[in-house]
Amino acid sequence: MASSISAAEVKVVPEEYNFLQKHVAFFDRNKDGIVYPSETFQGFRAIGCGYLLSTFAAVFINISLSSKTRPGKGFSFSFPIEVKNVRLGIHSSDSGVYDKDGRFVASKFEEIFAKHAHTHRDALTSKELKELLKANREPNDCKGGILAFGEWKVLYNLCKDKSGLLHKEIVRAVYDGSLFEQLEKQRSSKTP
């Protein structure tokens, strides 16, 4: 049976997007290059987060990133995030896996597991995740520390296995956004 959706109606992520832009583009639900709080909310719901977390994430993320990703533009109460400029919103106290331009730095990614995966070579336990966050925390950087903590805790809670391990391939997939697509597909296949 042929699909009722034409090729012109399907909006895809531009091929030239870097890893960080691809990560954020999942939340651009209509693929217009701008992420509004309602889209952030929809994206978090699509990957399996509850209403409260999705609401908090939409408000906090969009308020935090909107003005940073819209240089030279005035304040907007709709708190849009421009995907093309998301690199301008990279926060401190992070892992360094995204460089200043939003590109993936493989050596920094490998360093996460080389330094902090003590129990299993290719996975992090909750304790090891706390160690990672502590090691990456910059002095007097409350905001960056909170952002990093929130990102990693959501990832851990959504994706840890039955043994409480967050596997390397899962972490890798979050950096380019492909994990979000996988989670949405898994969730939609479970609902009637």
From Swiss-Prot:
Induction record: Not regulated by abscisic acid, desiccation and osmotic stress.
* Cofactor(s) the protein needs: heme b; Ca(2+)
Metal-binding: present as a keyword of the record? yes
**Catalytic reaction list:** RH + ROOH = ROH + ROH
Q: Where is this motif: Proline-knot?
A: 71-80
Q: What is its EC number?
A: 1.11.2.3
> So what family is this one in?
Belongs to the caleosin family.
Q: What is the lineage of its organism?
A: Eukaryota, Viridiplantae, Streptophyta, Embryophyta, Tracheophyta
Which PANTHER family does the record cross-reference, listed alphabetically? Answer: INACTIVE PEROXYGENASE-LIKE PROTEIN-RELATED, PEROXYGENASE 3-RELATED
Describe its function.
Calcium-binding peroxygenase involved in the degradation of storage lipid in oil bodies. May be involved in the interaction between oil bodies and vacuoles during seed germination.
* Protein's UniProt name: Probable peroxygenase 5
Which Pfam families does the entry mention? Caleosin
Could you cite one Gene Ontology molecular function of this protein?
plant seed peroxygenase activity
Question: Where on this chain does Ca(2+) bind?
Answer: 28, 30, 32, 39
Residues involved in heme binding: 23
Per the record, its GO cellular-component terms are: endoplasmic reticulum; lipid droplet; membrane
Phosphoserine is found on 178
Domain EF-hand per the UniProt entry, residue ranges? 15-50
- Indicate yes or no for the key word Oxidoreductase: yes
